[in-house]
Amino acid sequence: MNNYEGIFSKETMVLVRNRMTAFFYKHFCKPIFFRYDPENVHDYMTTVGRILGSNFLTKKLTRAFLGYTNPILEQDILGIHFKNPIGLAAGFDKDALLTDILPDVGFGFEEVGSITGEPCEGNSRPRLWRLPKSESLVVYYGLKNRGCVEISSRLRGGKFRFPIGISIAKTNCSATAEIDAGIADYFKAYDTFVGIGDYYTINISCPNAFGGEPFNDKEKLEKLLSKLETIPADKPVFLKISPDLSERELDDVLEVVSRHNISGFVCANLTKKRGESGKIMDNDVPEKGGISGRAVEELSNKFIADIYKKTRGKYIIIGVGGIFTAEDAYKKIRLGASLLQLITEMVFKGPQVISEIHQGLVILLRRDGFKNISEAIGVDNRFS
């Protein structure tokens, strides 16, 4: 009887299910998807996700094929309960259309957007490219979204089954390139979303917007955060930073943030670097756009470690970039990340990768004697 219990245990069944799904994605779905323009595939999968999230039966079936939970992964952070540590990063669900299905896919939370003060069509196409050898994407969307008014009206009063983060950025247009106008745009979007979602992220690091990334400058960042703080904060606020900051620029950001009501950091956004990381294996790489996936992994890990150590663990860190396996995720956690986000990994590995990573994390945590994931945060990066 015990042998049968082992064969048919929940963990074994999930492992077998994930391997079957991964095989099917690798040999059937991925070859088809990779024949088509990646933005068209993204839009198609968004439509599929909306359909799957539209009724109880399809949500239940999705959960049966992709879901995974384990108490060892649950955390309460900043008054928010997270069933799983991996969330969907901003940039995929730009208009918050997938909130009904993502919990069943296995995500512990999601960050919608980035959302701007005005509707934005983004940059001209093509604006998304795959780098298969590098397991990376080149992204040049330019903050495409339907704007804060439309998206907030749809989300307001909604009952969500997992935490929702609202990523705020400035509209990608020439008008917001002027600092005061850019701040006013952030302010409009931030103010519009008061009372909606569980946390906010101020995205100051989009590499594809008109005017660049002016708020990496400490005087301009000070001005932005001071203006936003005139709105009474009813939720935790994170700052999403670039992985391309110099150490001095990072120190400047930390200095400014220390004077404001910021709860943590999202580390990190897309990198503009092409060959410096040594992770770009593809020959034909577009010059425009930022890069996600493996190419940003080491940069992200360095920022997680630096921020955790420099601030003595004061801030909650959400780690993003190059999380393809449980070992990748575990490394970020042990360096100081409390939560994680991904997008690119689903493109190359399939949707079951979320469950694979979560199940693998449980194995790694138990191997090292941890009773909860929170005990592993920063253990490889202790400050004196």
Show the residue positions of the predicted features:
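A gly/proline- and charged-residue-enriched helix-loop-helix capping module
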Residues: 113-163
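An N-cap/entry alpha-helix motif that binds or orients negatively charged groups
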Residues: 16-75, 136-144, 148-149
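Glycine-rich phosphate-binding active-site loops on the catalytic face of alpha/beta enzymes
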Residues: 108-120, 264-272, 322-323, 329-356
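Catalytic cores of alpha/beta
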Residues: 95-104, 245-259, 309, 313, ...
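Glycine/Thr-rich beta-alpha phosphate-binding loop at enzyme active sites
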Residues: 59-68, 204-217, 255-313
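Active-site glycine- and acidic-residue-rich loops that bind
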Residues: 172-186, 214, 239-259
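C-terminal helical cap(s) of enzyme catalytic domains, especially alpha/beta-barrels
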Residues: 122-135, 275-289, 346-370
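Short beta-strand/loop segments at the ligand-binding rim of alpha/beta enzyme cores
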Residues: 79-87, 161-166, 231-245, 309-319
